[in-house]
Amino acid sequence: MAATLLRAKPKVTVSFEDVSVYFTKTEWRLLDLKQRTLYKQVMLENYSHLVSVGFAFSKPNLVSQLERGEKPWIRDDGMESAARSCAGNRIKTKTLTSKPKLFGRGLLRNTSRSSLQRRPHDFRPNPIVRYQHSRIADKRYLCQQCGKSFSRSFNLIKHRIIHSREKPYECSECGKQFQRSLALLEHQRIHSGDKPYECGECGKTFTRSSNLVKHQVIHSSEMPFVCRMCGKVFRRSFALLEHTRIHSGERPFECTECGKAFSRSSNLIEHQRIHSGQKPYICKECGKAFKGVSQLIHHQLIHRGDKPFTCHEYGKAFRGLSGLSQHQRVHRGEKPYECSECGRAFGRRANLFKHQVVHGGVRLQHRTRGKGFQRKLLEHLRDLHGQQPQEAGEGSSAEPQPIDTNEKPQVCERCGQVFENKLLLCRHLRIHDDEDDKKQKPVISSTSVLEDKSLLSQHLEAQPTEESDSEGSVVFVYAEKPHGPSSP
């Protein structure tokens, strides 16, 4: 149906002058940047619609000026020639030139009420606007499907495409189809690299005028969107929408694979890469791939050696914000991770996980030596043997099982030592960090602390002695201090 309407020429003759508005130089200066951008977009869209429905006429001078990026204003004495530039004009030239200084004000009246409120004395009644309003009131073109009426036939044609879901405008480069010619025009700029909308503040260019308007909010200090719950302000409406989901707990973006929900669509996209294994962000230095751009940025700090996050109290620097946050908890004494079994709190989540092994009653045991551990068997096996832990009670005759990993060898940039995986490299880097800390802190010898012989004897008695039980397991025994006089 829509395709037939596009091919059929409407009965009512429409010219570009019916849908165009002209400005003088004085009137053009009254427009702000948003109004100028909107004016350019509307004029180009009107022209493209007339061409798409089959109206054949030469390109108006106004359209040529807009396409070249020139200022579209004209002189007062050129208003009459501009009115005659388009053939088939149904509005008489006499009517157009009778009030030459009112052309631009008609658009201002329709597009920006705020500017009228700021400058009400600048505008007078416009007979052309009254004529256009009378035509809008007479909506002769009715949509039979939804009952919506239009004052112009090509608006009805454009509207019917929505019901038919047809996409008559196809990109010749990639074959993508669109319902509107303006959408096709904006899409083709992706292939051509054309970015006609430039920011006057920083020079950044955009393919769409709407993106330019959104970008210009950054330069302005206005933050019009306010959260009613906490009073936090935002520059963009979608940022406020994402923020309000924190208060409501709403997570509308759900993963179809595992059912996990997120408050932001970008977080869902990054999460889905876990299931697909996709890692589109690649480091140019070492070739390592990452699922998210934030992970890549954090990784690139290693190559540059940057530590942008600094503690203001002690001056210690960190690569990531999480490392600085954990460090600052030490100063503040915060321990947000609490054990649900005994109520003990920890400053790091990893320490909570290690602590919870005690409540689980699982005593992990080395399979070859029989050495018992409760917390750090996993670290012990990875550091020494590259093995996975096994719970006590399992057969000790099993051969050591290496960790299956596809990670590339990791090289320490400070000493050149090579490690099998990133975990071993991280543990090795702590040695260098400890060395740096020791250089900064004064060293106190044990002899200066234990000058009293009685304290020294108690210290030596508390040192563990190594014994072996019947099963061959290594056991550490602490010597008890004698309470009475020693026997002869």
UniProtKB/Swiss-Prot annotation:
Keywords: DNA-binding, Metal-binding, Nucleus, Repeat, Transcription, Transcription regulation, Zinc, Zinc-finger. Residues 14-85 form the KRAB domain. The keyword DNA-binding applies. Residues 387-408, 435-488 are annotated as: Disordered. One of its GO terms (biological process) is regulation of DNA-templated transcription. KRAB domain-containing zinc-finger protein that represses B1/Alu SINE transposable elements and modulates the transcription of nearby genes in a tissue-specific manner. It regulates glucose homeostasis and lipid metabolism by modulating the expression of the endocrine cell-defining transcription factor, MAFB, in pancreatic islets and, the fat metabolism regulator, ACACB, in adipose tissue and muscle. Belongs to the krueppel C2H2-type zinc-finger protein family. This is Zinc finger protein 92. It comes from Mus musculus (Mouse).
